[in-house]
């Protein structure tokens, strides 16, 4: 079977009977064995849980589960409590993590745990466990160290979480400067869980007593622990998830997509299109511009995007409307010569979507490579000038000031409004011209996640220069606002969030 893991997060109350049974089978076959410390007759027996155990979890509206499937096979699950305390603080406690033996060390556990602990605006993240690797993952995901002295200051909050976790006995928590233990009445064979990290955490959290587990928590107010390698891994992971982040934008519900007809009016005039013109839509997303052209009778239409999910949506709309558009999955940084076009549209910040400046310039080169001589393109990019004027979070070099990014407020802007110009939620790196955001996605049928999104923004002079240096004559480059592309704004007008460029291939 090909390994193509698929993830999702749902409320436990939404688990089907089939999923409940799959969780039971996964746990019972892969969790471990009893130590026999509470009952010698159980020693060596597999620890098993019935489907009813998981069904009971569904009675608590604060219980969630993240699942990993490969086809129909459940590879892993992470159950967790997500609770808002009376003071409004959000907390997450992972109550169970299991991964199929045959699929361990492939990053499944980390992805599942990130869905529970990866939201940076929470007050506390934690679990009870005998597995040192899981404690290390908690520290890695939250950028903080598990410290018994800090845990001891928050026993009231932890007690409120214990009230919703049947196995956690808040009356038997032992925390001091050398230990952090909680009685869970659980007796797994601890020796088989030992690894190279075990002694490290025994020295910090204490020796695990019979029936107890480590109580491991980190908290929002703790100092963050920065590591260069970890930093690079976080940014690289987020870059790899860029496709997923853009595909999860609920574009049909976002206000900036309401002006499609007006935008196509502009494109038709700027490119002098006739019904026989061949048009390429680069970074088409759900295909709204290509669909509008098809609706108007244009027949020779092609649209590229790197997200199969967005293209599936676009194809469905085209089929429903009876439109013929050639949708293809392509990375627009690397378009090979083949079909040539009379006009290309590349709208809403496709150029600028990547951290590396050269990647964004590669899109410009790709456009030139598929555009007929004398053909025109219409491109929009995010306006760095307004971004810099309005920035309230800025550093000269984010790599030298990582805390600025780690402490940046998170939002669900991409999933909800698409307003990526809200200065409260972005950090400007003035040396690289990268704009960082922490984007959260929840309860959309996919894995709950927080990603660090970095986009490159251009000044008007910079985008003109980029096109002129790559084989184009720039015909116009204007500051514009939504729904008024034919009414350019003056420099300094804070309504001009986009720079709209029309260029002709030389």
Predicted feature residues:
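Terminal substrate-recognition subdomain of acyl/acetyltransferases
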Residues: 1-20, 24-35, 118-236, 240
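A conserved beta-strand-loop-helix scaffold within acyl/acetyltransferase catalytic domains
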Residues: 30-94
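Conserved acetyl-CoA-binding loop-helix of GNAT-fold acetyltransferases
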Residues: 99, 105-117
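Conserved class I S-adenosyl-L-methionine
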Residues: 237-274
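Class I SAM-dependent methyltransferase SAM/SAH-binding core
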Residues: 290-334
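A short acidic, Gly/Pro-enriched loop at the edge of an enzyme's catalytic core
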Residues: 336-343
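A short glycine-rich, Lys/Arg-flanked "PGG" loop and its adjoining helix->strand segment in the class I
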Residues: 361-373
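SAM-dependent methyltransferase
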Residues: 378-466
């Amino acid at each position: 079977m090909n390994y193509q893991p698929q993830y999702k997060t749902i409320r436990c109350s939404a688990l089907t009977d089939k999923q409940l049974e799959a969780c039971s089978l996964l746990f019972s076959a892969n969790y471990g064995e009893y130590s026999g410390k509470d009952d010698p007759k159980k020693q060596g027996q597999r620890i098993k849980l019935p489907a009813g155990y998981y069904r009971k979890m569904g009675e608590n509206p604060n219980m969630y589960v993240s699942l990993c499937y490969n086809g129909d096979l459940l590879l892993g699950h992470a159950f967790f409590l997500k609770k808002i305390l009376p003071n409004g603080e959000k907390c997450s406690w992972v109550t169970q993590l299991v991964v199929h033996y045959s699929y361990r060390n492939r990053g499944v556990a980390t992805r599942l745990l990130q869905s529970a602990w990866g939201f940076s605006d929470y007050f506390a993240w934690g679990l009870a466990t005998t597995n040192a690797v899981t404690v290390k993952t908690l520290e890695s995901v939250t950028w903080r160290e598990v410290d018994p002295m800090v845990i001891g200051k928050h026993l009231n909050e932890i007690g409120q979480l214990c009230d919703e976790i049947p196995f956690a006995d808040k009356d038997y928590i032992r925390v001091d400067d050398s230990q952090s233990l909680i009685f869970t009445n659980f007796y797994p064979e601890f020796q088989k869980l030992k690894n190279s990290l075990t002694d490290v955490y025994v020295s910090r959290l204490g020796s695990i007593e019979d029936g107890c587990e480590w109580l491991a928590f980190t908290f929002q107010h703790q100092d963050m622990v920065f590591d260069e390698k970890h930093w690079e891994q976080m940014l690289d992971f987020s870059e790899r998830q860029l496709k997923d982040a853009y595909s999860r934008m609920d574009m049909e519900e976002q206000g900036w997509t309401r002006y499609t007809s007006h935008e196509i009016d502009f494109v038709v005039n700027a490119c002098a299109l006739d019904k026989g013109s061949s048009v390429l839509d680069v970074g088409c997303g759900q295909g709204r511009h290509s669909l509008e052209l098809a609706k108007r009778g244009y027949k020779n239409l092609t649209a590229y995007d790197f997200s199969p999910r967005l293209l599936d949506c676009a194809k469905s709309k085209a089929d429903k409307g009876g439109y013929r558009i050639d949708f293809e999955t392509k990375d627009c940084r690397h378009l090979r010569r083949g079909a040539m076009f009379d006009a290309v549209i590349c709208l809403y910040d496709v150029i600028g979507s990547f951290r590396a400046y050269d990647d964004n310039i590669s899109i410009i080169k790709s456009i030139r490579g598929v555009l007929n001589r004398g053909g025109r393109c219409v491109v929009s990019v995010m306006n760095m000038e307004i971004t810099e004027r309005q920035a309230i979070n800025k550093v000269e070099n984010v790599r030298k000031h990582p805390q600025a990014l780690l402490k940046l407020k998170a939002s669900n802007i991409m999933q909800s409004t698409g307003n990526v110009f809200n200065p409260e939620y972005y950090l400007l790196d003035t040396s690289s011209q990268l704009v960082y955001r922490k984007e959260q996605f929840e309860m959309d049928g996919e894995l709950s996640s927080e990603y660090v999104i970095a986009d490159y923004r251009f000044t008007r002079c910079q985008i003109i220069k980029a096109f002129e240096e790559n084989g184009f004559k720039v015909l116009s480059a204007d500051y514009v606002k939504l729904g008024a592309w034919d009414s350019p704004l003056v420099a300094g007008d804070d309504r001009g969030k986009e720079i709209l460029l029309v260029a002709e291939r030389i």
